[in-house]
Amino acid sequence: MQKIPWTPLLLTMLTQAAATMAAYTLSTASPYIAPDLGVENEDVAQLVAVVYLLGAMSAMTVPPFIHRFGGMTISIAICVATAAMLSIASFASSIGILTLGALSLGVLYGSTAPSSSHVLAPLTAEKRRNFVFSVRQIGVPLGGILGGLLVPPLILIGGWRIAFQAQLIFALVMIFAIFLVRSRYDHGRDRNRNVWSLTGPIRLVGLLRELPEIRPLAIAAFVYSGAQLCFGAFIVTQLVRVYGQDGYHFASAVALVAFQLSGITTRIVLGVIADSWISARWLLVAQGFLMTLSAIVAAGYDSSWPYWLIVINCALAGATASGYTGLAFAEFVRMGGPKRTAEATGLGTALMFFGVAAMAPLFRLGIDIFNGYAIPYFLVAALTAASALLLAIGTRR
């Protein structure tokens, strides 16, 4: 196996894990946070979409900062923002203060992929690109798994506030670890780069005009990521509604972990396959159609269903809606080229996060309008199928 930049790869992966765990704690702990703050479970869970909305904006504005200060320095800033969110959330006395915590994380949440891609792309051989970026993206489901496994016991031990406070240790350790190697990887910085120019976001949008082949991928990134959060952020609330409060521990510690763990294993396997046998584009098409199947099944969840069937479908949702991102980012890196890695992955991140920010609140609204999850999931199925079809047509051309 050709050399893989393991040190920056693992550090950037764990940075993503720390930020994701903090964000997903909002949904995992929502059944306990909501009564304390006098709101509905879904009102807390949808704050994850607030993180992603602000993250989308940060993804579009961060590339100049990456070029000037370096990807590892930005990774430190991400961990600082994560620590700020955890501190604010742990002392929240209202949904407004909790929202402020979500905003403090979101302001740099979208910087994870562009900053790490800027560091990893020049250090990674082309034949290992899909594998490296798939491993890097493991940080997302890893953070979700840590949240699913650790948050419920922490809540039982000391309440939901402890669940946020305990994560501060992880964030602070990451700040120190990245600082130790920052100078080794933050080389070639453009110290004269104007970081406040408005042309940065314009350049990102301009890639859609300059690179026609990126457009179907852009649409798929938007829809697939929206579907990912519709599955991931609402697994706990949906299963609590189906099985009652007694189903909380199954939902958070089994179903949600199955979703995230499947995303981890799939990313690694598909990264190897894409580097050796089947192109990343066709794998992304297949994932879209399987995502559609999983959404249709999720629409029919009922209290008469055995737990094992729910777990299987959660694993399928994780393998597709969560497992696709490594391949997608590798494709954005390939299309952007070495000089526009931060910009191309910034565009990809922004589209993914805008998809989350748009689809998750609409999904939440659909739950209220249709008094359940069935029709919202059927709509998700229609969108993922259409996106996969467009990507397939674009790939054939």
Q: How would you describe each model-predicted region?
A:
Residues 333-370:
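A late C-terminal transmembrane helix in Major Facilitator Superfamily
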Residues 68-78, 275-289:
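Cytoplasmic membrane-interface "Motif A"-like loop-to-helix N-cap segments
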Residues 57-93:
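Conserved MFS/SLC helix-loop-helix module at the cytosolic interface between two early adjacent transmembrane helices
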Residues 1-2, 185-217:
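Juxtamembrane intracellular "pre-TM" segments in multi-pass secondary transporters
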Residues 101-140:
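Cytoplasmic helix-loop-helix junction between adjacent transmembrane helices
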Residues 24, 52-60, 144-145, 260-264, ...:
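Residue-level signature of mid-helix packing/kink "hotspots" within the transmembrane helices
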